[in-house]
Structures are given as C-alpha cells and as structure tokens.
Amino acid sequence: MIGIGIDIGSTAAKAAVVDGEGSVAWTCVQPTGFSSVDASERLREALAAAGYDVTGDDVRVVATGYGRVAVPYAHKVVTEITCHGTGAVRLFGDHGTVIDVGGQDTKVIQLKSGRVAKFAMNDKCAAGTGRFLEIMADRLGISQQQMADLARSGEPTKISSMCTVFAESEVISLIGRGEPRENIARGVIDSVVSRVATMAGQAAGAPYYLTGGLCENAYVVERLAALLGSPVTTSPQARFAGAIGAAVRAAALA
C-alpha cells in the first residue's frame, strides 16, 4: 500500500509519499495561500505530475494540519499531534522531545516507546512562532535567512514584549534610535527561541528534535541548543514531519 500524507499548515502545505517498502519516496511543499482547499488541490496536481494518483486502488491518503478538513480526497483525517509524533518516530527514534515551530503555533511532544506520552501547544500568541520571525524580518526589510545571518554578528538586544504587536513596536523604536540591524535581528531570534525553550524545558527533556520550517535555520537550532543546554537534532526532512507521519498512517490503512 502506498501512503500519502497531506499536511495543510497555516503558511505551508506539504505532501509526503511512503512507498510499499515503507520508505519516504517523495515530498513537496508549497505556500498555503488564501485557500486551504486550493492548496490541497495544488498538492494533488503535484502528486499526479510525480506519478501518484490519489484515487488509485493501492493508494491511501491521510490529511492533517490546520486545514486538514479541506482535503476532499483524504480517506482519513488525523490530528497534528498524532501525525507529528508518528513522523518524528520515523525520522529520529521512539524516545525524546519533539519541538515543532509552525507558522502560527508551537508544539512540544514527548515521545515514549514510539507513542505520544504528552504534549503542549501554544496557539494563542504568535510571539513564539515562525510568523513572528516573518513579521520582524519584513519590518527590518530583509529575509528570514538574512536576519539569521545578521544575528550571528549582533549583540543581544532584549525584545521584552510577549505580544507580537507590542514587540513590533519595540523593534520600530529600536530602528528609530539607530540600533544596528544585526543587534535587532539577534534580539528578535533570541526572543522566539527563549519562548520555545521555555516550553520545551517543561517537557521530559533530552534528546530534543526540531521539526517545522525553522529547522532549516541553523542559527535558530544553535541558539535553541544553547538555551536548552543539550544538542538539538534535526533532519533535511524534518519540516515534513507531519506529512510523513500522515503518510505512514495512510500506508497502514486497509
């Protein structure tokens, strides 16, 4: 059985295919855009172009994520926590703490013996999410990668507000005072990482695994490891953890 996982997030829509041998055979990521339904259709078209027919007799599809109910061709809908846990087990192992920083929320999942033992989620405030970094990078007139590169050479400038709106006002004030851009970039990233580390530190502890879009930001990984006092492991496929977990579960459907 071929399993296809569709993970419609708030900012990125991802698909993953697990083949009959249980290997991750294909992945794809696209911006979610305005419509989750349109995003799921674009992923279906990408799958078809890659040779995967979602209506095939030997294919099963599981949808997850923020827009999981907007995938009309899914055979089953499964929660984000379950799919991220399953995906993390496939990528990293069956024990540890998974930290997933998404566009609009941050999830911390404790794995024990290959199962989700407990989890915590911050979906009420964007200040500890990828969206916060996106907003601040826009305010600084640079990309998120440029912000990370600048932050390496910056001195820490404290961004104290717990609210994205007020934090943006702080950044505007710092810009107005002539604070070097690299210092502001360092302060912004440290602000996000400290919030994430606080959540993760309340879980079971090491080993730590980072998934989600920020796993591709090496500076974020370094700063998170420094604050946790423990290595943080990631993977080239870590941003697809939810989709991979959904695909694994799809492959197990009868």
Predicted regions and their residues:
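Short glycine-rich, Thr/Ser-proximal phosphate-binding strand/loop in the N-terminal lobe
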Residues: 3-45, 117-119, 123-124
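Glycine-rich phosphate-binding/hydrolytic loop that grips phosphoryl groups
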Residues: 133, 235-254
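Glycine-rich phosphate-binding loops at beta-strand->alpha-helix junctions
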Residues: 200-227, 238-242
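Glycine-rich phosphate-binding loop plus the immediately following alpha-helix
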Residues: 35-36, 113-159, 163
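Short glycine-rich phosphate-binding loop at a beta-alpha junction
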Residues: 54-66, 202-214, 232-235
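Gly/Thr-rich phosphate-binding beta-strand-loop-beta motif of the actin/hexokinase/Hsp70
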Residues: 1-21, 95-112
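Adenine-nucleotide phosphate-binding core of ATP-dependent small-molecule kinases
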Residues: 167-201, 239
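Short beta-strand-loop/turn "lid" adjacent to the catalytic site in phosphate-handling enzymes
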Residues: 20, 28-32, 50-82, 110, ...
